Design a protein with these regions (language model features):
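Two-component/phosphorelay signaling modules centered on CheY-like receiver
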Residues: 12-31
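Short, conserved "switch-loop" micro-motifs in signal-transduction and mechanochemical regulators
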Residues: 86-87
Length: 123
Protein backbone atom coordinates (compact mmCIF):
# COMPACT_ATOMS: atom_id res chain seq x y z
CA UNK A 1 0.00 0.00 0.00
CA UNK A 2 2.84 2.37 0.76
CA UNK A 3 0.91 4.41 3.35
CA UNK A 4 2.53 5.47 6.61
CA UNK A 5 0.57 5.84 9.86
CA UNK A 6 1.89 7.44 13.04
CA UNK A 7 0.44 5.65 16.09
CA UNK A 8 0.57 7.65 19.32
CA UNK A 9 -0.25 6.15 22.72
CA UNK A 10 1.44 5.90 26.10
CA UNK A 11 0.33 2.25 26.36
CA UNK A 12 2.80 -0.16 24.78
CA UNK A 13 0.05 -2.78 24.63
CA UNK A 14 -2.27 -0.48 22.68
CA UNK A 15 0.52 0.50 20.27
CA UNK A 16 1.35 -3.16 19.64
CA UNK A 17 -2.32 -4.04 19.06
CA UNK A 18 -2.90 -1.15 16.65
CA UNK A 19 0.31 -1.89 14.78
CA UNK A 20 -0.55 -5.58 14.48
CA UNK A 21 -4.04 -4.83 13.13
CA UNK A 22 -2.75 -2.34 10.58
CA UNK A 23 0.24 -4.35 9.37
CA UNK A 24 -1.65 -7.65 9.08
CA UNK A 25 -4.78 -6.27 7.44
CA UNK A 26 -3.47 -3.36 5.38
CA UNK A 27 0.29 -3.52 5.04
CA UNK A 28 0.60 0.10 6.22
CA UNK A 29 3.97 1.14 7.55
CA UNK A 30 3.61 2.11 11.21
CA UNK A 31 5.76 4.45 13.25
CA UNK A 32 5.08 5.08 16.93
CA UNK A 33 5.31 7.76 19.59
CA UNK A 34 4.66 7.54 23.35
CA UNK A 35 3.22 11.02 24.01
CA UNK A 36 2.15 14.25 22.37
CA UNK A 37 5.59 15.88 22.40
CA UNK A 38 7.21 12.85 20.81
CA UNK A 39 4.33 12.69 18.31
CA UNK A 40 4.97 16.20 17.00
CA UNK A 41 8.67 15.61 16.38
CA UNK A 42 8.03 12.16 14.84
CA UNK A 43 5.33 13.58 12.58
CA UNK A 44 7.59 16.35 11.29
CA UNK A 45 10.42 13.89 10.55
CA UNK A 46 8.37 10.91 9.32
CA UNK A 47 5.70 12.83 7.33
CA UNK A 48 2.95 10.26 7.95
CA UNK A 49 -0.11 9.99 5.73
CA UNK A 50 -2.29 9.83 8.86
CA UNK A 51 -1.95 10.19 12.65
CA UNK A 52 -3.91 7.94 15.04
CA UNK A 53 -3.47 9.49 18.50
CA UNK A 54 -4.63 8.77 22.04
CA UNK A 55 -5.93 11.73 24.03
CA UNK A 56 -4.83 11.03 27.61
CA UNK A 57 -1.02 10.85 27.70
CA UNK A 58 1.82 12.18 29.87
CA UNK A 59 3.86 15.29 28.99
CA UNK A 60 1.33 16.47 26.37
CA UNK A 61 -2.19 15.22 25.71
CA UNK A 62 -3.65 14.50 22.29
CA UNK A 63 -5.72 17.69 22.14
CA UNK A 64 -2.66 19.91 22.62
CA UNK A 65 -0.53 17.80 20.28
CA UNK A 66 -3.21 18.06 17.61
CA UNK A 67 -3.32 21.87 17.96
CA UNK A 68 0.46 22.09 17.67
CA UNK A 69 0.59 19.74 14.69
CA UNK A 70 -1.87 22.02 12.89
CA UNK A 71 0.61 24.88 13.36
CA UNK A 72 3.26 22.94 11.40
CA UNK A 73 2.88 23.73 7.70
CA UNK A 74 3.86 20.19 6.72
CA UNK A 75 1.10 18.70 8.92
CA UNK A 76 -1.83 21.07 8.35
CA UNK A 77 -3.58 18.69 5.96
CA UNK A 78 -2.50 15.39 7.52
CA UNK A 79 -5.59 13.54 8.80
CA UNK A 80 -5.54 13.20 12.59
CA UNK A 81 -7.87 10.75 14.31
CA UNK A 82 -8.10 10.96 18.08
CA UNK A 83 -8.71 7.79 20.12
CA UNK A 84 -9.97 7.68 23.72
CA UNK A 85 -12.20 5.88 26.17
CA UNK A 86 -14.26 9.04 26.66
CA UNK A 87 -17.14 9.59 24.28
CA UNK A 88 -19.06 12.35 26.04
CA UNK A 89 -20.26 15.10 23.72
CA UNK A 90 -18.18 17.87 25.31
CA UNK A 91 -15.05 15.73 25.14
CA UNK A 92 -15.66 14.88 21.47
CA UNK A 93 -16.30 18.56 20.76
CA UNK A 94 -12.99 19.48 22.41
CA UNK A 95 -11.30 16.99 20.11
CA UNK A 96 -12.72 18.57 16.98
CA UNK A 97 -11.90 22.05 18.27
CA UNK A 98 -8.28 20.93 18.66
CA UNK A 99 -8.15 20.29 14.91
CA UNK A 100 -8.71 16.56 14.57
CA UNK A 101 -10.47 15.14 11.52
CA UNK A 102 -12.23 12.35 13.39
CA UNK A 103 -12.63 10.79 16.80
CA UNK A 104 -13.14 7.15 17.83
CA UNK A 105 -13.60 5.52 21.20
CA UNK A 106 -11.87 2.54 22.78
CA UNK A 107 -12.04 -0.38 22.74
CA UNK A 108 -11.07 -0.27 19.09
CA UNK A 109 -12.88 -2.50 16.64
CA UNK A 110 -10.35 -3.62 14.01
CA UNK A 111 -12.79 -3.51 11.08
CA UNK A 112 -14.08 -0.08 12.07
CA UNK A 113 -10.54 1.25 12.49
CA UNK A 114 -9.38 0.00 9.10
CA UNK A 115 -12.50 1.29 7.34
CA UNK A 116 -12.02 4.73 8.92
CA UNK A 117 -8.34 4.90 8.00
CA UNK A 118 -8.98 3.75 4.44
CA UNK A 119 -11.60 6.48 4.07
CA UNK A 120 -9.11 9.17 5.07
CA UNK A 121 -6.31 7.64 3.01
CA UNK A 122 -8.45 7.52 -0.12
CA UNK A 123 -8.64 3.76 -0.43
Amino acid sequence: MGKKVLLVDDSTTTLMMEEMILKQRTGYECVTAKDGLDAISRAVVEAPDLVLMDVVMPRMNGFEACKRMRMESSLRKTPIILVTTRGEEDYVEAGFQSGCNDYITKPINGFELITLLQTYLGE
